[in-house]
Amino acid sequence: MLRALKTHAEAPIVVATRAASTNAEKLEEIRERLAKGPNFHDFVQNPDNTRNEWEQYDGKLRREKGEEQRLRLPPWLKTTIPVGKNYAKIKAQMRELKLSTVCEEARCPNIGECWGGGEHGTQTATIMLMGDTCTRGCRFCSVKTARKPPPLDVNEPVNTATAIASWGLDYIVLTSVDRDDLPDGGSEHIAETVREIKARNSNIFVECLVPDFRGNLECVKTIANSGLDVYAHNIETVEKLTPYVRDRRAHYRQTLQVLTEAKRFNPNLITKSSIMLGLGETDEEIENTLKDLREAGVDCVTLGQYMQPTNKHLKVIEYVTPEKFKHWEERGNELGFLYTASGPLVRSSYKAGEFFITSILENRKKRQNDTEVPKKQ
């Protein structure tokens, strides 16, 4: 009886050992297949995302009135995950110097390309000044909000200039949160940052994407005369949708006034604005917005697809096709903008150093230098 129990007890052990051996072999086989197969980056990169796939896409691109379900992301809006040494270097330095970027805070889809350098190897980063918390609550933006954000970092202008100087960039974009809690909206802080950057490298082109300062023209003047090259302020959407999309303190006509006055304070500035598409605007409204910007003297305009950052933000009404964006690029150029950047993934500061603005500024500088050279007797 005891012998029988022993034999009976040993049998499962043999079976269990064989099962464990089989499982180990399967696990090793899976590991080998994973090592030889595509990695996570390959999966996200989606190499099949070709123009043919764009043209053949027959998914729904517009939500009808009353529909709650979100639209599926079309193939032309899928981007690669951010990787690479350049990306890691910039991110590490941002943390070390306690700097914020709109690239991260606004969850920009182009962060990997801009920080990594893209196919041309030019790095572009958009520094967000005055912290990562905004006093406004626009319904399209994922930046944190509060009525009274933390105090300004007095070392930020120097830290920002130090970082930018070490990168060796030709073009830098400075943006900021709104700081309605400050008497001057932070305009002097931004201007000081520009001066620090220019003191270290007078050849670098500086673009400032700034708030409306609640229409305070003294603040606009402070920025316009700080030494920057490009004054940018975004109109964001068409006039009809402005109260629905932007914070209640932001006004369509106020934005146009800010852009107009910036040019009046400094006629040598290039002025720039941006429009998001896909929020329910009509073609006629887009056309009128472009005309309003031109009448305000705006030189450059960008048009890009609105993408819902979280479930708490405005839903996308329509995914605009690349062909439609091409139409608006052509229309913008017809209206007389010096440069029109229009595409699904275009953002106000997207690859700023590679845009036409750089060549405009370089040509202006060359003409200025030529006129300053004394003629030979």
UniProtKB/Swiss-Prot annotation:
Upper classification of the organism: Eukaryota, Metazoa, Ecdysozoa, Arthropoda, Hexapoda
Name of the protein this chain belongs to: Lipoyl synthase, mitochondrial
Essential cofactor(s): [4Fe-4S] cluster
Domain of life from the UniProt record: Eukaryota
GO cellular component terms given for this protein: mitochondrion
Pathway noted in the entry: Protein modification; protein lipoylation via endogenous pathway; protein N(6)-(lipoyl)lysine from octanoyl-[acyl-carrier-protein]: step 2/2
Family to which the UniProt record says this protein belongs: Belongs to the radical SAM superfamily. Lipoyl synthase family.
UniProt GO MF annotations: 4 iron, 4 sulfur cluster binding; lipoate synthase activity; metal ion binding
GO terms (BP aspect): lipoate biosynthetic process
Keywords: 4Fe-4S, Iron, Iron-sulfur, Metal-binding, Mitochondrion, S-adenosyl-L-methionine, Transferase
UniProt entry tagged with the keyword Zinc: no
Domain Radical SAM core as annotated: residue spans: 119-338
Note: This protein may be expected to contain an N-terminal transit peptide but none has been predicted.
